[in-house]
Regions:
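Alpha/beta catalytic barrel-like cores
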Residues: 1-57, 65-68, 117-135, 139-216
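Eukaryote-skewed repeat-based solenoidal scaffolds used as protein-protein interaction platforms
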Residues: 59-137
Length: 216
């Protein structure tokens, strides 16, 4: 707790930060050039507690696509949407995160096919269902512009995926409407040896750079 409030309540009420809960339990072994999520035990109970008792707004769940493989990509997206519907039915909004590895030798083709499959699943959703997406910055600029306009989609955010901070920000700036959800790139210059002043200055500089790329 923080100042007598549960963390999620403090984040939203005091800081205006939407609370998100990571619910996946890591990645399964690679098959068909992808890694699905491992089974998530007691998901229904976790979601009920998160939403009703802790006021969590959304969830995050990650899988990875390493190469172009239609069956693998279909499996990833099917699993993501299955979990997303369970999250929605529990009263929260899922962040669907099918990361396309930046070293994928057929990254552009994988992203294009993934988008086709995503659109197939979106078309089957009831009109009231909402989801978010956290995606690798695409090889083809503005690939996800149409996805952002889908009425089911609350937001499309970008993961840094192993790109350096400079490169991630540059690539993001070329994709209008995508905003950063960087962790690796955000933290790349932080060191435990830094003084409080150095740490704070590094954080502020990263935020400024990433924010500028998000609104470009």
């Amino acid at each position: 707790m923080i100042d007598g409030k549960y963390t999620a309540d403090y984040l939203w009420q005091e800081k205006g930060i939407v609370p998100i809960l990571k619910i996946d339990k890591g990645l399964a072994e690679e098959k068909n050039h992808v890694k699905l999520m491992k089974p998530i035990p007691n998901l229904a109970e976790t979601l009920k507690h998160a939403v009703e008792d802790r006021h969590i707004f959304g969830t995050k769940e990650r899988s990875v696509i390493y190469d172009y493989d239609e069956q693998g990509i279909r499996d990833v997206i099917a699993q993501q949407f299955d979990i997303a519907l369970q999250v929605w039915n529990a009263g929260a909004v899922a962040i669907i995160e099918p990361e396309v590895d930046i070293h994928n030798p057929h990254k552009a083709e994988s992203e294009a096919f993934m988008l086709e499959v995503i659109n197939e699943h979106l078309a089957k959703l009831d009109s009231d269902v909402k989801v978010m997406f956290k995606l690798t910055i695409p090889t083809v600029n503005n690939l996800y512009t149409g996805l952002m306009k889908d009425p089911h989609v609350v937001r499309v955010v970008a993961l840094s995926g192993g790109y350096s901070q400079d490169e991630a920000c540059h690539l993001l700036s070329l994709n209008h409407g995508m905003i950063a959800s960087f962790s690796r790139a955000f933290a790349q210059d932080l060191r435990y040896q830094q003084s409080d002043e150095e740490f704070d200055a590094t954080v502020k500089a990263a935020i400024a750079k990433i924010y500028a790329a998000s609104i470009a």
